[in-house]
Amino acid sequence: MADEKRTSIEEPGTPMSYSTAASPELLSSSNNASALPAYPSSQTKQDKESLSHDQAVRVEPESSTPLTDSVEDNESGAKVKKDLHFWIIFSALMLIAFVAALDMTMISTALPAITANLPPSTIAANWITSAFLLPMVASQPIFGGLSCSIGRKWSINSALVIFLVGSVVCATAKTFLVLVIGRGIQGLGGGGIHSMCEIIMSDLTTLRERGLFFGVIALVFAVAGFAAPVLGGVFSEHSWPWIFWINLPIGAISLVLLIIFLNIRVPLLTGKEKWQKLDLVGNAVLFGSVTAILIAVTEGGIKYRWSAWQIWVPLVVGLLGIMLFLVIEWVPNRIAPKPVFPLDLFRNRTASVAYVQTFVHGVIFYGVIYMVPIYFQAIKDRTPLQSAIWSFPLSAPSFPFAMGAGVLISITGKYKLLIFCGWMLMAAGIGWMTHWHVGTSKFEWAFSQVILGAGLGIMFPITLPPIQAALPASRLESATAAYAFTRTFGAVWGITAATTIFSTQAAKNLRPYYDQLNPLGLSDFTVVAFSEQLRNLPQPIQGVVKGVYADAISDSYWLFVPLAIIGFFTTFGMKELPLPDFIKSEAKLEQKQDVTPALKSSAAHAVVNVKTEVPSTLP
């Protein structure tokens, strides 16, 4: 009816809603003036012009529920309180981030046991890792778009369900092929988990706080980095499928908590805008390009020579595809009107440098974490569990240094000096590790890991705040998704390049001995997976193989030294931007409140959906 408006009151945090008829007088009464601002005063001119006659309009009250103790909302200036609601969401996000990070690196320690328990296959063992990383990288921009289209809750929950399905496939796999497929499904969900955790935390925290909370996230990754080889070693010695079964109870608990408590309202989009946000063409080109590059670097030097067409053709196609992707994203066109990587993300010098440093940090962190257990198993005759314990000096310093860096950013709002310190420690630590050999002493391998771990820990929480400080709030989702993509893309190159250098060098230097080694199971395809079995080789061939492995591992570490130096010098190109103490996000956390039927002022904290007939010409 023209003289009656139908008002739906949605109680945040609950799936049910109810409707009541409200007269125009009630909506405009003085008692409710603060709770329900007169429509359409809360809409911009552009919003008014895009409204349809039936469109539901979300009206946000001027006096909103506080979300944190010490921050002000960037629009209303209201004090925000982090109550139990917030901490439940935060805890659930940290749990699923932990299991996703765990599965990213835990497989490296258990790889020899998995290889020994599955039927022989022509699939290279490092594809178990690559199959996880490829969809993980490609899915992060997609979930960034989904978070705007279907909302934060269903994006993160969808990613979690996909990850758990992949875990079941991996745990029940009886062949290498099925295991690789399961890892691919896991990676698809894992990419969404990583991207959405950072987007949601950016919604709920201020730029100043973000250093602290991302320090906690870094702590989670550091704990996962230490726990992964330990758990991988334990499970590989008893039952390797539990590497994947362990994800189910943790994931199920988190899923229930997020369904109940996570209710973040994002700006309304039309159906067309939602599709545009997904950027299907751009994401398809990116996925194909990353796939081609990963095939080339994974198979190069192992299954085929680097000069073979089977390697350089996909490599060239992948690099050309990346160039095409950038053209699609950066040149205005109808194919990608709302690109996942808009050009303005990289027009700001500070943001661009931070993205480069995020990539380099991902390369070094994941490459080193993957290679260190191989050194201890192959050279020092350690079991998977023992190699994890001997890797503790690398992970242990990451805990306090990540948290310390986050706290310092939160207190001072400064980050450049910390970044300089992080790169210096990383360069010193990895430089020392290039001198590891068969006879390296405990002091040398332990202390060099401590130095590197401190630098890696410092860098975890401090590259995202300058990115978000340099860009407008409207770019938060795309900027954060690009950050997650950049770091994981670095992980792909770090793990793949390190294992490729190691495998190529070891295979090349072992070929003269293959007449003795092939009957024992060592070949170009099994160089990485065979590391645990070196201690079972007869003398003197065991000493020869250990020397070759030690040199190959040292060669892989040399890759990271110039990267750390580059990271240090790029810091001079950053500006020390202020980190304001307000929430820089267009999304809002909805909290459960009591709503009275009379719509008194106590209902000011509710989210009201007003469905009304909108005149064709709005004032």
Swiss-Prot record:
It is a multi-pass membrane protein. The chain crosses the membrane at residues 87-107, 131-151, 161-181, 184-204, 211-231, 242-262, 278-298, 311-331, 359-379, 389-409, 418-438, 450-470, 482-502, 552-572. One of its GO terms (cellular component) is vacuolar membrane. Residues 1-74 are annotated as: Disordered. MFS-type efflux pump; part of the gene cluster that mediates the biosynthesis of mannosylerythritol lipids (MELs), surface-active substances that enhance the availability of water-insoluble substrates. Mannosylerythritol lipid production is responsible for hemolytic activity of Ustilago maydis. MMF1 is directly involved in the secretion of MELs. Residues 21-42 have a biased composition (Low complexity). This is MFS-type efflux pump MMF1. GO terms for molecular function: transmembrane transporter activity. InterPro entries: MFS, MFS_dom, MFS_trans_sf. Belongs to the major facilitator superfamily. The gene is MMF1. Disruption phenotype: Impairs the secretion of mannosylerythritol lipids (MELs). MELs not only have high potential as eco-friendly biosurfactants due to their excellent surface activity, but also have attracted considerable recent interest because of thei runique properties, including self-assembly, anti-tumor and cell differentiation induction activities, and moisturizing and hair-repairing properties.
